[in-house]
Amino acid sequence: MVKTNTNKLTDDQISEIKESFDMFKSDNGKLDNDQIKYAFKALGCEITEETLELIKKKGQKSISFNSFFELVSPYIPKRDSMSTLEQAFKLFVKDGSGITFKDLKKVAINIGEECSDSDLYDMIEFADTDGDGVINKSEFISLMTTKKVL
């Protein structure tokens, strides 16, 4: 695995890596190979099959946050933020038309997130600013670039 200088990453980038890891991790607190791929894509990065094979050859069935951080952090400064958001959008929908309830439910199931149908509909309603029942790319980008205020 690649060692990196965390000084090259901003606090926001480090938080983003942690959020991606937390979103896809298993109950054991680690990522398996499929979850690693999803977490990379959510960050707008692509992991090579060769890298995944190296992980397997080391006998690892899953990796910890520290290993994931070392693996993904060299990719973070090189990515373009708009293409990152477009990659994340594509995680939800394959045809590019928008994120539907069905798409959101499928992703929730794939990442092991237990959400009620009501919660999923609330998420869509919150992000769907034009009221058509679908989260289009611009709504998704707007949602993802809005600072959370707590």
Swiss-Prot record:
Q: Where does the protein end up?
A: Cytoplasm, Cytoskeleton, Microtubule organizing center, Centrosome
**Which Gene3D superfamilies does the UniProt entry name for this protein?**
EF-hand (1.10.238.10)
Which positions are tagged coiled coil?
none
Top-level taxon of origin: Eukaryota
InterPro entries annotated for this entry? Centrin_CML-like, EF-hand-dom_pair, EF_Hand_1_Ca_BS, EF_hand_dom
Please list the residues that bind Ca(2+): 128, 130, 132, 139
**Does the record bear Cell division in its keywords?**
yes
What is the protein's species of origin? Answer: Dictyostelium discoideum
**GO molecular function per UniProt:** calcium ion binding
Miscellaneous note, as given in the UniProt record, is: Binds one mole of calcium per mole of protein.
- Stated family: Belongs to the centrin family.
Which PROSITE patterns does the record associate with it?
EF_HAND_1 (PS00018), EF_HAND_2 (PS50222)
The record describes the protein's role as: Plays a fundamental role in microtubule-organizing center structure and function.
Which Pfam families does the entry mention?
EF-hand_8
Q: What is this protein called?
A: Centrin-B
Span of domain EF-hand: 12-46, 80-114, 115-150
> Which UniProt keywords are listed?
Calcium, Cell cycle, Cell division, Cytoplasm, Cytoskeleton, Metal-binding, Mitosis, Repeat
Q: Which biological processes are named by the entry's GO terms?
A: centrosome cycle; microtubule cytoskeleton organization; microtubule nucleation; mitotic cytokinesis; nuclear envelope organization; nucleus organization; regulation of centrosome duplication
Transmembrane residue ranges: none
Gene Ontology cellular component? centriole; centrosome; cytoplasm; nuclear envelope; nucleoplasm; nucleus
